[in-house]
A protein has these predicted regions:
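Long, charged amphipathic helices and adjacent flexible linkers at domain junctions
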Residues: 249-262
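Ligand-binding beta-strand-loop-alpha-helix segment within the catalytic cores
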Residues: 32, 36-134
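N-terminal glycine-/serine-/threonine-rich phosphate-binding loop
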Residues: 1-22
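Structural motif
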Residues: 1, 22, 102, 132-136, ...
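Short acidic, glycine/serine/threonine-rich loops at helix termini
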Residues: 32-39, 100-102, 145-147, 178-183, ...
Length: 262
């Protein structure tokens, strides 16, 4: 919760500088925690959660709880700063429709979904009103069926549809190292800038990503976004205080930026 409040303060500051923000939250740790409490195993395939009815209930509960926590974090303003008392207006809604993942390689993903459509006009109108748009990975099909999507899939799809200037992932990993897979050291620091061609070449060398700590997990989404017109995609560590501000406003940044240098 403390980290959420700090990130909310950074986002409030960035928005006050005139940046239009769409925030997509995840809920993977919360769902896994609930499943564990119920004695139910978390199952994945192809890097996607297999969402049975128990996992779907957990996802719905986590989505609701996180929305309240995020709205609370943004309602606290910035004490002891010139922005004390300033509130960020947050609007969330059914800006997305979902479709089922279906069956892949004989695996039935049940209630796991992908983005079917993004209401870009609705999101743009909301941003133009000066509000921050909050999106959840819990979404519905045109027939009202509930689906559990991944935060990465939602964020990437929305960034592409909006043709956003940046796609930023706040992640468990610090970024991508010069020598991926090798231990962190002075000789193997974070690669702060990765041209799109180099990122694509690296993806081909890596094994398919299955979990968020795999090097290629966020990189594949960064590459997808850059190929589709989003000029810059970033992988940042959420544990580092001020990571967003450092990445956006300091020349060398702090995580890894994938850039399309066209």
């Amino acid at each position: 919760a403390g980290k959420l409040h700090a990130i909310a303060q950074d986002l409030a500051l960035i928005q006050a500088m005139g940046v239009k923000l769409v925030l997509v939250h995840g809920f993977r740790p919360q769902v896994n925690e609930q499943l564990q409490a119920k004695g139910h195993e978390a199952r994945y395939s192809h890097g996607i959660r297999i969402t049975d009815s128990v996992a779907l209930d957990c996802a719905q509960e986590a989505a609701g709880q996180l929305r309240y926590e995020i709205e609370a974090a943004f309602s606290q303003g910035l004490p002891n700063t010139p922005m004390a008392g300033a509130t960020v207006r947050i609007i969330s809604g059914n800006f997305l429709t979902a479709r089922p993942v279906g069956i892949m390689d004989g695996v039935d993903f049940q209630h796991s979904g992908l983005v079917r459509k993004v209401d870009t006009a609705g999101i743009t109108r909301t941003l133009d009103m000066g509000a921050l748009v909050l999106l959840s990975p819990f979404n519905y099909s045109p027939t009202g069926e509930a689906f559990n999507l991944s935060m990465e899939e939602v964020a990437t799809s929305v960034a592409i549809e909006l043709q956003a200037d940046k796609l930023i992932f706040m992640t468990e990993v610090p970024g991508i190292r010069i020598q991926p897979g090798e231990p962190a050291s002075d000789d193997n620091p974070i690669d702060t800038e990765l041209p799109l061609a180099a990122a694509q070449a690296l993806l081909k060398q890596l094994p398919p990503a299955q979990v968020p700590t795999d090097t290629g997990f966020y990189l594949q989404h960064c590459v997808k976004a850059c190929k589709a017109g989003v000029e810059r995609s970033h992988i940042l560590p959420f544990k580092t205080d001020g990571a967003l501000l450092l990445e956006i406003y300091v020349h060398d940044g702090i995580g890894t930026m994938v850039i399309d240098e066209k």
